[in-house]
Swiss-Prot record:
Protein name listed in UniProt: Probable ATP-dependent Clp protease ATP-binding subunit
Region feature (Repeat 1): 21-86
Pfam families, per the entry: AAA, AAA_2, AAA_lid_9, Clp_N, ClpB_D2-small
Organism whose genome encodes this protein: Chlamydia muridarum (strain MoPn / Nigg)
Molecular function per GO: ATP binding; ATP hydrolysis activity
Residues annotated as signal peptide: none
Organism classification: Bacteria, Pseudomonadati, Chlamydiota, Chlamydiia, Chlamydiales
One GO biological process term: cellular response to heat
Residue stretches making up the Clp R domain: 18-161
Length: 870
């Protein structure tokens, strides 16, 4: 190479050198020139090339240097320390190449030739400057405690990994062993330096595209596998068969299919397997990694063929393909075959053993359609574990999560994670959802306790304040004050360092516990149920429920008592857990509190009125309207939108579902509710089972309400309990006449609401007045309504046929309308603080305490204010 350069005219030497340089290598030269100009150097040395390589930020050389801990800033500081800046002179043109740089370029070309590369890249440039024993770049690396031999080893590894992604030459294909060995022998002594052996170990296809589970378990990188002994035993039996010894684990996502395979790896490592499996290696094949980067036809087939050849060669390899359905169609291009067709002959002959894992749906869609592929695999159906088995699994994983989050997990938290996830987290399966609850609970506790103590924060603020005062003193040339502040800052920093060390040690010693409350908070975030309601004693909460409802739903104590009894039966576990928490039919006249009671149940049981899903059954008067509830069938308009009811329950599975006025719906539509009431589920148009087990089903109806109005014995009060019993029998008869027996039998209870008595209406008026008073507080006003006015409002608003709703209009007409006019008056807005109401000849008069101001309201006309009245 030196002779060739001498025979070339000097003006053409650089052109010859850069002829094979890649774009990145040329960019390195440009960056190196800029670094030379920055340092005021009129030459380009090996140190500038090193800085150019690091500043480029990409390429094999940069990856290797970063792996060894060398970055641009570190190298730049070392170069500046060694050679410093040049004199401040104007440099015209490009800096001249030093002799060492020219030799390094020659060496880079030689390295590329040795590696049989027809280009010079950043890796060759790095090897070239390493060959200059007296170069500044090599001295910089040695000062940074970097061994050149390590750089060469890392470059070789990087190049071998890269070669696996190119069309094979091939280092992994057995048919090309001659070219592979010759290439290896040439690259074993790059630049005349040994790489730690006569021949470098080639990167195998299995190592490139897979992960050795048995090796990972030896290194304690896998979680322990608890239980699943039956599935692991069946897996071992299938693997020990002579033919068709390829098991496939089929189960829903999250039931632990991959964990079963890891359990097999655990048994292989511990020797708890038959002799035929004792020396086996279990390797997970990453199919996505194998497909990635295959730009040319035949590359994918070569890679998978190399894996199969290596499995045949070793003879002790068990392949595990997670998401087995991905092999169908994987790598198939125009004129090519997919992975499943490549694997099928070897699987049939027993040349390779493969363990698959996939879900039930994916197995049906992809594997079962290919009968030849299906018969080569033996199915193992994996069912979700029970709650007790999940608790044992969590106990086995407890230590791993304690170490990760640096917390202490109580046994109560493990039990709560299993039970609460099974009860409240739907659409997913144990043990995955229980593990996720425990993991998030540990993260929540850890994050909440990571904050620094207030004393540390105060000390840091004091240090910052002292530092600013010191800088200000330096700026004003008060050097004695600055020196004093410097000493004070030093003391504060020492104190801060000691406090931080003590805090860190205390944090490590005193682990924060993860208890049942922490798990309940995670469930609360995921489901919307207040955590306090989950952890509160059930007996206390259910005893409080009846009293709370009676305070808000007036005059229906018997109905409230009936629904509370049914809820107690459900929540104490006496009822069937596969049915809804409660299903009720509310009967009675309008305006007596049926919908209000449903709203209050939503508030008390689920924390808010937004947990009430209200379905107006008058929208389902036609038979075909049933599709609106659960979604249109496939092929019909609106299929992708889903059902109005099913989609709402999917998004909020913990709610009160109110079917209003069910007698207006088509009778056939009521048949849809049979499976909701009996089995606690409804299948939507997509085939998904919507869970109603954590809902309270309430239906309202006015059936038999006319009987209450026609009964002369019942006015605003019942004469005796027998009178109410007679009416109940008549209403029950009307319900049985209109609704089917199979529907009525599935209800927990039919609740009949009584007409409101006068005392109940008086309490309702007081509730409305209290609401009005709370709204007036925003205007700094207080309201005083005497009993005489309340009695007047009750007399004006009561109606046995209309219930309590007329009371709202009475309050608006006699109280809210005149108050609104008073608020609009400037004098009232500024001065009024407390308003008193008086009843004068069926007029409600409002007066201020400091100055009498009356506002008369005619019972049959709009509110008005006159000077005489005030």
């Amino acid at each position: 190479m030196s002779y060739m350069l001498k025979s070339i005219p000097p003006r053409h030497i650089q052109v010859f050198m850069f002829e094979k340089f890649t774009n990145r290598a040329k960019q390195v030269i440009k960056l190196a020139k800029k670094e030379a100009q920055r340092l005021n150097h009129n030459y380009l040395g090996t140190e500038h090339i090193l800085l150019g390589l690091l500043k480029l930020g990409q390429g094999v050389a940069v990856n290797v240097l970063r792996t060894l801990g060398v970055d641009f800033d570190t190298a730049k500081n070392e170069v500046e320390r060694l050679i410093g800046y040049g004199p401040e002179i104007q440099v015209y043109g490009d800096p001249a190449l030093t002799g060492r740089v020219k030799k390094s370029f020659e060496s880079a070309n030689e390295e590329a030739s040795i590696l049989e590369h027809n280009y010079v890249g950043t890796e060759h440039l790095l090897l070239g400057i390493l060959n200059q024993a007296d170069g500044v770049a090599l001295q910089v690396l040695e000062n940074l405690h970097i061994d050149p031999k390590e750089i060469r080893k890392e470059i070789l590894k990087e190049l071998e990994t890269f070669n696996l992604q190119l069309p094979p030459s091939s280092s992994i294909t057995p048919r090309n062993t001659n070219s592979s060995s010759s290439s290896s022998s040439k690259s074993s002594s790059l630049g005349g330096h040994s790489l730690g052996g006569d021949k470098p170990e080639k990167l195998s296809a299995l190592k490139a595209y897979g992960y050795d589970l048995t090796e990972m378990f030896k290194e304690a990188r896998l979680d322990p596998v608890i239980g699943r002994s039956a599935e692991v035993e069946r897996l071992i039996l299938i693997l020990c068969r002579r033919r068709k010894n390829n098991p496939v684990l089929i189960g829903e996502a999250g039931v632990g299919k991959t964990a079963i395979v890891e359990g097999l790896a655990q048994k292989i490592v511990s020797g708890e397997v038959p002799e035929a499996l004792r020396k086996k290696r279990l390797i997970t094949l990453d199919l996505a990694l194998m497909i990635a980067g295959t730009k040319y036809r035949g590359q994918f087939e070569e890679r998978i063929k190399a894996v199969m050849d290596e499995v045949r060669k070793h003879g002790n390899i068990l392949l595990f393909i997670d998401e087995l359905h991905t092999i169908v169609g994987a790598g198939a291009a125009e004129g090519a075959i997919d992975a499943s067709h490549i694997l099928k002959p070897a699987l049939a002959r027993g040349e390779i053993q493969c363990i698959g894992a996939t879900t039930l749906d994916e197995y049906r869609k992809h594997i079962e359609k290919d009968a030849a592929l299906e018969r080569r695999f033996q199915k193992i159906v994996v069912q979700p574990p029970s709650v007790d088995e999940t608790v044992e699994i969590l106990r086995g994983l407890k230590k791993k999560y304690e170490e990760h989050h640096n917390v202490f997990i109580t046994d109560e938290a493990l039990v709560a994670a299993a039970k609460l996830s099974d009860q409240y987290v739907h659409g997913r399966f144990l043990p995955d959802k229980a593990i996720d609850l425990l993991d998030e609970a540990g993260a929540r506790v850890r994050v909440n306790t990571m904050g620094q103590p207030s004393e540390l924060l105060r000390l840091e603020a004091e240090i910052e304040s002292t530092k600013q005062a010191k800088e200000q003193a330096i700026g004003t040339q008060e050097y004695e004050k600055a020196a004093s502040l410097r000493d004070e800052e030093k003391k504060l920093r020492e104190k801060l360092s000691n406090m931080k060390q003590q805090w860190e040690s205390n944090k490590e010693e005193h682990q924060v516990p993860v208890d049942e409350e922490a798990v309940a908070q995670v469930v609360s975030v995921q489901t919307g149920i207040p955590a306090a309601r989950l952890t509160e004693a059930e007996s206390e909460k259910l005893l409080m429920l009846e009293n709370t409802l009676q305070k808000k739903v007036i005059g229906q104590d018997q109905a409230v008592a009936s629904i509370c009894r049914a809820i107690r039966r459900s929540r104490t576990g006496i009822k069937d857990p596969n049915r809804p928490m409660g299903s009720f039919l509310f009967l009675g006249p309008t305006g007596v509190g049926k919908t209000l009671l449903a709203q209050q149940i939503a508030v008390e049981m689920f924390g808010g009125e937004d947990s009430l899903i209200q379905v107006d059954m008058s929208e389902y008067m036609e038979k075909f309207a049933a599709t609106k509830m659960m979604g249109s069938p496939p092929g019909y308009v609106g299929h992708e939108e889903g059902g109005h009811l099913t989609e709402q329950v999917r998004r909020r599975p913990y709610c009160v579902v109110l079917f209003d006025e069910i007698e207006k719906a088509h009778p056939d539509i009521m048949d849809l509710m049979l499976q909701i009431l009996e089995q606690g589920r409804l299948t939507d148009s997509f085939g998904r089972k919507i869970d109603f087990r954590n809902t309270i089903i309430i239906m309202t109806s006015n059936l038999g309400a006319d009987l209450i109005r026609k009964t002369g014995e019942i006015g605003f009060g019942l004469r005796s309990h027998m009178d109410y019993g007679v009416i109940k029998e008549k209403i029950d008869a009307a319900v049985k006449k209109h609704l089917k027996p199979e529907f009525i039998n599935r209800l927990d209870e039919s609740v009949i609401f009584k007409p409101l008595e006068k005392e109940a209406l008086s309490e309702i008026i007081h509730l409305e007045i209290n609401k009005l008073g709370s709204r007036l507080q925003n205007h700094q006003m207080a309201l005083n309504i005497p009993d005489s006015v309340v009695s007047f409002l009750v007399d004006k608003g009561h109606s046995p046929e209309m219930g309590a709703r007329p009371l709202r209009r009475v309050v608006e007409q006699y109280l809210e309308d005149p108050l609104a006019e008073m608020l609009l008056k400037e004098s009232c807005r500024q001065e009024a603080r407390k308003l008193c109401a008086r009843l004068i000849e069926e007029r409600v008069i409002f007066e201020r305490e400091d100055e009498i101001s009356a506002l008369a309201v005619e019972g049959d006309g709009p509110a008005s204010v006159t000077a005489d009245e005030s």
